[in-house]
Amino acid sequence: MKRCLRNGNGVNEDRISDLPEALLLQILSMLPVKDVVTTSVLSKPWRSLWKLVPTLKFDYENNQSEDETYSEIVCRLLLSNKAPFLESLHLGFRFGECRSVEVGMWIGIAYARHVRDLVLHVESVKGSFIFPTGLYNCETLESLTLRSWVLVDVPSPACLKSLRTLRLENVDYKYDDSVYNLLSGCPNLENLVVYRGNLLEVETFTIAVPSLQRLTIYDDNDGEYCTGYVINAPSLKYLKIDGFKALESCLIENAPELVEATIMNVSKIINEKLLETLTSVKRLSLALSPLELKFSCNNYSGHLLL
């Protein structure tokens, strides 16, 4: 039965409310949380529909209110959600706006709701937000993004058995062991994206993940500090390296299944061992201007499609 909505010019049919609930929830999942909640005033069928949306995205800009703080908004809406499971939780806030214990509680609730995708984005000019160490343990999490001023402190091996995708974007690391403990606790990790700037608490970034298939490293270090990478990924098929000043400190120890490699925005390649490890690659893309090789590459051209 089609419902009708009256306005000053006549009668309009309410076709949207006749759509299947699953489709309506999919549409609502694409909207900011603030807009999703406002749909509750449309009509009676919409009154509680927003509580069933399985994705919650809280950005600072879209969740400001004169009556409630960011923390109060997140807590209220997270506890009001009645979806069978939580597909995605995105928390974006400014440093000092939320306490670590609050964020830990929200993520703990999401873990209890079997969340699959978690994004934590912290904006700061003062310091780094400490991601609660106890939250590196979740059976259902499939995708994790830690972005900007987040301190990664993993004193013991993590337990993220279902994690398939991990993005570490300009975060801090307390110790070298934090990287090892995090990655070693992801036995099914397939896609790893690492963005690094001048925050160089880790001198050698070791990536030893047997299940890894895709790896992207973007290093925006201006060259003042020396950073190193060691890659041990026997299942790796796709590799992208972007932004290095000089590829002298990237060692690929084990990547026999590598099919495609892309090297971009690199000033020069001065480490012959790097190309020696790429002999199994079917396609090598070099986006270097100007291209400067400190050695002959004649020994490798027969294996590569340039």
From Swiss-Prot:
The keyword Phosphoprotein does not apply. Pfam families: F-box, LRR_At5g56370. Residues 13-73 form the F-box domain. Gene3D superfamilies: 1.20.1280.50, Ribonuclease Inhibitor. CDD domains: F-box_AtFBL13-like. Keywords: Leucine-rich repeat, Repeat. LRR repeats lie at residues 67-93, 98-122, 138-170, 171-196, 215-243, 263-288. The keyword Repeat applies. InterPro entries: F-box-like_dom_sf, F-box_AtFBL13-like, F-box_dom, FBL13/AtMIF1-like, LRR_dom_sf, LRR_FXL15/At3g58940/PEG3-like. This is F-box/LRR-repeat protein At3g26922.
